[in-house]
Regions:
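Phosphate/diphosphate-binding loops
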Residues: 140, 148
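Predominantly a Rossmann-like dinucleotide-binding segment in NAD(P)-dependent oxidoreductases
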Residues: 9-17, 21-122, 150, 155-157, ...
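C-terminal helical cap and adjacent loop that interface with cofactors, partners, or active-site loops
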Residues: 79, 86, 90-103, 108, ...
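Short, surface-exposed connector motifs at secondary-structure boundaries
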Residues: 10-15, 138, 205-207
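Active-site beta-strand termini and strand-to-loop segments that position acidic
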Residues: 131-136, 159-161
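Structured core elements
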Residues: 46, 108, 131, 141-143
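Serine-hydrolase-like catalytic core of hydrolytic proteins
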Residues: 1-10
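Short catalytic-loop micro-motif centered on adjacent basic/acidic residues
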Residues: 15-18, 141, 210-211
């Protein structure tokens, strides 16, 4: 993917990744202020993506196992990476953005499949918690859950030496808790902005290329899954150089093996 991104850059082609919060005006302005020092040096970030269960498309006797998995792709790691990749990557991407798109050096995590246990939900977990370690001492604590009847919260909490921030509230606070700044500008749909800026870049011959940070943020999410599935401390080098292959034996309309649910301390992910 990184090579393809570089090739697109050489050819003057645009890539807009779908990591949509980078196109939200309020989030952009808020994170730009963090990057400009509005809360001092960032010391830690808490990323919450705590939601209820998602959809399931059911089954049909006429479907092959391959078709069934494609229709219910979020529940199979070869298609989704688990929900801390396909969903929580949006939160992790904001943390990466705030930290200058630098790689974490390691991750330690825990997770499991406690509530969503029916075999129709494939083999993914229903909760993950990961601590990412960065070379400058910053820790990113990332929590994601898809369980019914629990407290929900989707927010980015950023803590600095001179204040704190809730990114999705577009709000920066002083150390005493008083609001120091709050975004009050326009709030167009970030999905529309993605398309507008992509089309503008093509018309004006000024390519946008999100490929590099898209690949790295996705790798951060995958690294987190490796940590929660294995129960081990996973380094960036181990994750990036992993030879684990999640793909099916053949891409054809037929039976596809469903891997067993990961067991931390037993499952090998590296």
């Amino acid at each position: 993917v990184l090579e393809s991104s570089e090739l697109a850059k050489k050819k003057g082609l645009s890539i807009v990744s779908g990591l949509c919060w980078r196109y939200d005006y309020g989030v952009r302005e808020t994170i730009n202020r963090i990057l400009d020092g509005a809360i001092g040096d960032v010391v830690s970030i808490q990323e919450n993506y705590l939601t209820g269960p998602l959809w399931h498309r059911g089954n049909d006797p006429s479907w092959s196992q391959m078709e069934y998995q494609l229709r219910n792709w979020i529940y199979f790691t070869w298609l989704s990476g688990d929900h801390n990749v396909e969903q929580h990557v949006h939160s992790l991407d904001k943390a990466q953005w705030i930290l200058g798109d630098t790689n974490p050096i390691a991750a330690v995590g825990l997770g499991g499949r406690q509530v969503r246990t029916d075999e129709k939900y494939g083999h993914i977990f229903d909760h993950h918690a990961v601590c990412y370690e960065y070379a400058n001492g910053v820790r990113v604590h990332a929590y994601t859950r898809q369980q019914a009847g629990c407290a929900n919260d989707t927010e980015d909490y950023v803590f600095g030496t001179k204040g704190s921030c809730q990114v999705l509230k577009h709000e920066i606070r002083k150390p005493n808790g008083e609001i120091a700044w709050k975004y009050s500008g326009p709030k167009p749909s970030m999905y529309q902005v993605e398309h507008d800026e992509l089309f503008r870049s093509i018309r004006e011959g000024k390519p946008i290329n999100n490929g590099h940070y898209m690949a790295l943020s996705t790798m951060v999410a995958i690294m987190g899954r490796m940590a929660t599935y294995s129960g081990q401390r996973v380094t960036w080098e181990q994750a990036f150089n992993s030879t684990v292959d999640l793909s099916p034996k053949a891409y054809e309309w037929g039976d596809v093996e469903v891997p067993p649910v990961a067991m931390p301390g037993i499952t090998k992910e590296i």
